[in-house]
Amino acid sequence: MYLTDPIADMLTRVRNANAVMHEKVDIPHSKMKERIAEILKEQGYISNFKIVTDEGNKKNIRVYLKYAGKERVIKGLKRISKPGRRVYSSVDDMPRVLSGLGIAIVSTSKGIVTDKVARAEKVGGEVLAFVW
């Protein structure tokens, strides 16, 4: 299946699984999606993730979602920069999600990082998504 926007597909799968309180969700693998899952784990939005291979020898990322009792840890996921409308931000204009309570995932020349890391390293880039 061909996807126009694989990052939006990943975020939608996580959002939908989170909405119905699933324990885990499988996402087709790419290095960019793996790095986004890594950031979500580092920031405490998911409990874990691992790379699994299915019977067709295709790699998937299995994301284990995190809940605080019956409360969802991920309140929202939003795709910002889309294939039809790219959104770039300089270090000075880097957005703050919910006044710093959420994170922005940014693709920079130093890799895919959070908005806080991008500010610390003084680099701008493409704002991929907001998570809160």
UniProtKB/Swiss-Prot annotation:
Pfam families: Ribosomal_S8 (PF00410). It comes from the Bacteria. GO terms for cellular component: cytosolic small ribosomal subunit. The keyword rRNA-binding applies. Part of the 30S ribosomal subunit. Contacts proteins S5 and S12. Belongs to the universal ribosomal protein uS8 family. One of the primary rRNA binding proteins, it binds directly to 16S rRNA central domain where it helps coordinate assembly of the platform of the 30S subunit. This is Small ribosomal subunit protein uS8. It comes from Fusobacterium nucleatum subsp. nucleatum (strain ATCC 25586 / DSM 15643 / BCRC 10681 / CIP 101130 / JCM 8532 / KCTC 2640 / LMG 13131 / VPI 4355). The gene is rpsH.
